[in-house]
Amino acid sequence: MAEETQHNKLAAAKKKLKEYWQKNRPRVPAGVNRNRKTNGSIPETATSGGCQPPGDSATGFHREGPTSSATLKDLESPCQERAVVLDSTSVKISRLKNTIKSLKQQKKQVEHQLEEEKKANNERQKAERELEVQIQTLIIQKEELNTDLYHMERSLRYFEEESKDLAVRLQHSLQCKGELESALSAVIATEKKKANQLSSCSKAHTEWELEQSLQDQALLKAQLTQLKESFQQLQLERDECAEHIEGERARWHQRMSKMSQEICTLKKEKQQDMRRVEELERSLSKLKNQMAEPLPPEPPAVPSEVELQHLRKELERVAGELQSQVKNNQHISLLNRRQEERIREQEERLRKQEERLQEQHEKLRQLAKPQSVFEELNNENKSTLQLEQQVKELQEKLGEEHLEAASQQNQQLTAQLSLMALPGEGHGGEHLDSEGEEAPQPMPSVPEDLESREAMSSFMDHLKEKADLSELVKKQELRFIQYWQERCHQKIHHLLSEPGGRAKDAALGGGHHQAGAQGGDEGEAAGAAADGIAAYSNYNNGHRKFLAAAHNSADEPGPGAPAPQELGAADKHGDLREVTLTSSAQGEAREDPLLDKPTAQPIVQDHQEHPGLGSNCCVPLFCWAWLPRRRR
């Protein structure tokens, strides 16, 4: 803005000078130069243009008069001075312009620096924000780490306490080990004797069981033939009854069609009679109206007596026809009622016959059920024989590995000690202890250097290898026993719960002989069912004895020497009860030689007081509570 104002002032000054010189050049007075020469002074130049003010020039112009050539020369010198002044001012102006340009450049540089500083400040603010976010995340992570450290410290304390408890338990188990080894020496002698006895008895039991199974199969075949014959007879009777019923149905349909036709004809006749009655009533009403009309004033012709008699006869005839029609209607209504009653009776007879047919069909189905039941039982017998063969093969394999029954008992007790010793290494011991409680298995003898980890790992590998075969045997036996008991009880319960209660009476009275006296095919079927029940009960008892002998010879220490853990576990589990199958087994269980010995009693008490010290739930295989299930 300052430069523009200066330029404008310069331009205005130049214009004024030009105008001034154009006006005052020929009229310059001479006295002015003289005065200037005498005085020797130069008139002051104005800052705006360096020229004299117009008032002085005007006064000089009016004072002096006409100009001359001398005065023109005198005037040229101040003009030159003024031109020099103008040149100096232009130089100054150019310098000022250069300074202004340099200032503008400096201003641009300063603005550029300010922008760069603003960008740097923004970047610094962003970096500060990111640093604040990182600081917050680090604080949160620090808090999480502190909580994790707190939980870790708690878990470490808990693990330390558990390790102390496990160390105490290990010490106690090592103390019990010596006592158990002393008790084992007493058990070995008794187990050897029992193993020898059971090995000799197992063959006799197998042969006897095979004979029983063959006899049962023969009985079942005979019963199946009888049932097939009775079933064929019942089918023939059913066909005859069906034919008879179909013939009766055809007859009744014919009769019903005839009766319906008769009813239709009677209805038509009734309608015709009703129409006739209506016509007669109309004619009577007309005659009555004619009789009631007044006589005309003219003397009417007197009807003759013949006409009167004729009219009376017609009235009598019409009255007789009406009475006959009424009687016919009453007779037709009675016939209709009788026909309706007959139809109802016929419908009731048909309904009763249908009910009888349904009862016969149900009886046939019930008689056909025992045949399917016995077929299923035959298939079950075959499957049980196959399972027995598999069990024998597995027992032979185990017999090759475990030569003596005493070593088996030793292996069980030492395995419990090993399962108690394992928790000292970590939490894996608790898992192994729980597995041992679920499925106790015979284990080999424990090595003496249990404290070394290498010996423990090799020992556990050996235990796993030995446990696989025993697990297979246990699973097969459990599967066989559960399957046999459930199926047998289902079939026997089904046979006992037949309608009429005759199967139960026949089972209690003696099969065919007493059921036959009750009459008919139902007695024969009930007697056959009772014979099947008796045969299967004998077979079931023999099969239990055989499996008990085989199981005791292979895995169990004997019916007379149950483990202390088994005695405690049978009370804890409600669905597992120690139920002996024969009275001899009960006597042996009561006369337990281990419980009478003073060395075994403290061991049993120790296991009862300390259930965590390897007290595995060793329940015998034949202790399933199947009798309460059957009572339910």
UniProtKB/Swiss-Prot annotation:
Gene Ontology cellular component list: cis-Golgi network; Golgi cis cisterna; Golgi cisterna membrane
Coiled-coil residue spans: 85-150, 209-421
Residues that span the membrane, as ranges: none
Annotated keywords: Coiled coil
Biased amino acid composition, Gly residues: 508-520
Matching InterPro entries: GM130_C, GOLGA_cons_dom, Golgin_A
Biased composition (Polar residues): 38-50
Keyword Transport set for record: no
GO biological process, one term: Golgi organization
Annotated region described as Disordered, given as residue ranges: 1-76, 423-445, 505-524, 552-573
Family membership noted in the UniProt record: Belongs to the GOLGA8 family.
Protein name: Golgin subfamily A member 8N
Organism: Homo sapiens
Gene name per UniProt: GOLGA8N
